Swiss-Prot record:
It comes from the Bacteria. Its EC number is 6.1.1.23. It comes from Desulfosudis oleivorans (strain DSM 6200 / JCM 39069 / Hxd3) (Desulfococcus oleovorans). It is an enzyme of class 6 (ligase). Keywords: Aminoacyl-tRNA synthetase, ATP-binding, Cytoplasm, Ligase, Nucleotide-binding, Protein biosynthesis. It catalyses: tRNA(Asx) + L-aspartate + ATP = L-aspartyl-tRNA(Asx) + AMP + diphosphate. This is Aspartate--tRNA(Asp/Asn) ligase. Its main location: cytoplasm. HAMAP family: Asp_tRNA_synth_type1. One of its GO terms (biological process) is aspartyl-tRNA aminoacylation. Coiled coil: none annotated. The gene is aspS. Homodimer. The keyword ATP-binding applies.
Amino acid sequence: MVDTLGNMRRTHTCNELSAASAGTEVVLAGWVQRRRDHGGVIFVDLRDREGITQVVFNPDREPAVHAKAHDIRNEYVICVKGKVEKRPDDMVNPKLTTGEIEVAASELAILNTAKTPPFMVEDRIDVSESIRLKHRFVDLRRPAMQKNLLARHRAGMAAREFLNSQGFLDIETPFLTRNTPEGARDYLVPSRVNPGAFYALPQSPQLFKQMLMVAGFDRYYQIVRCFRDEDLRADRQPEFTQIDLEMSFVGEEDVMAIGEGLVANVVRQVTGEAVDLPFSRMTYDQAMADYGLDKPDLRFDMKLVDITDIAAGCGFQVFSGAVKNGGIVKALNAKGCADFTRKELDDYTEFVAIYKARGLAWVKVREDGWQSPIAKFFTDDEKASMAQRLNMAVGDLVFFGADAASVVNDSLGNLRNRIGERLGLVDKNRMCFLWVTDFPFFEYDETEKRYQAKHHPFTAPHEADMEHLHTDPEAVRSRAYDLVLNGTEIGGGSIRIHNRQVQEKMFEALGLAPEDYTAKFGFLLDALDSGAPPHGGMAFGFDRLVMLLCGESSIREVIAFPKTQKAACALTDAPSPADKKQLDELFIKVTADINKE
């Protein structure tokens, strides 16, 4: 039998009382973190989202209340009335904000019991993530999780505060929209009242926010849920949140300035740290040349170096052959790492294979020259040229990649990050923001054998590059920009196309016939033909930003109820089969049995 609250109402949180509160009668409510019986006196650590307060049940003062406290167990929900007392000097707990006081209980209500939890409600737990997600309501009681979700709340409040102060309007856009199959797969929602037709859940509010600019709202924002049916990684979820914004009558610098101000306010409100403005800038071409990735981590200095010209005529067929086939050769100098073991070198070779590299050549620089299986293939002049360009010194370890540019950049760029972590070169306490600009408009899809938009087809191209549209599409740069924090993309955007004729040209360059793009995007073209202002915007990955500010490695740690790596909810067992009646109403027939292996 459990109690009711009765007339007791909480007066303070469990992190609010101090020595100055001594003598005050208070009412606290929360969960039992721990119960201890010391020679008849029962001590209970009472926990709520704010912290912990020690409650004392003394048999000499309140025998009936003390007797009732014998029934208390971990995670019981209780309400306690009592008087705040200073602890004896030898019992002060400096680890608690409330460590100078305790509450001497005079009344106790056991509001609910609790079965033994699957794991302790504390930060240091040795339990699998699957069990944590299955019992998320228990997992979320842990201080670390409560701290993360509080940080998420503060980040959202800070974003709204800043954007409101800059004249942005918070406007909602539809979740049920039309399917426009570009990029990642859409989640489809069948329409009962329109048999055979489907809505799509939005991957972003992109087209609707452009409509709002055409409608004259000037500045829009939304902290919005988006959906993508794609394979998951540590920083991806099928449903995710972004801070979305759009502005009229602007160029890149205007949008980027707003983005910097927003991020600075979020960081200050969440971490208390100031951010140096403006952020660093780097073009896409520069990022790829020096770091191999379009989201470089600038917290440590280790650049890729192109040696294609030196390798072109060398005797090592792997290098010269790659150049002959239109590829490149790059090198990465890991200073002072010549003592890496063969096992470590083999591990790195396996690592770059993830990024389609077919091998990893290396050279250790010793007092007596190069130590490497490939040393014999190079002339003294070639060695001297590489040594000078790569700043090679005794004790260095140099890695080489030779293949198509995309493979070399991807493999060595990620190897750079891995070695930086391995050597402890990454300053974990530093936040390094970077704008990457001037992305290619197109990227070639080897699978579909056609060009696709690198960002999305509504991004404006650089006007000066339009002459290359049909002769050299890869030379066309977009007016796009990504914001990178410590090697992770946290936001991206662009100036949009606001002219119908230009938009149609870009659709056609992507291989869409007029009847196709009119069917899919006719409403956008009509809007662009109805007085569309120049406009641009961006979106921030809210989950990812909060993850980085909290020092976590997965966005699942900053989302209350995340999906698993298989896009499932371990708590509710979603997705689940629908019954036949529901499917019949939707004119859907399931042809595969999901219960079969």
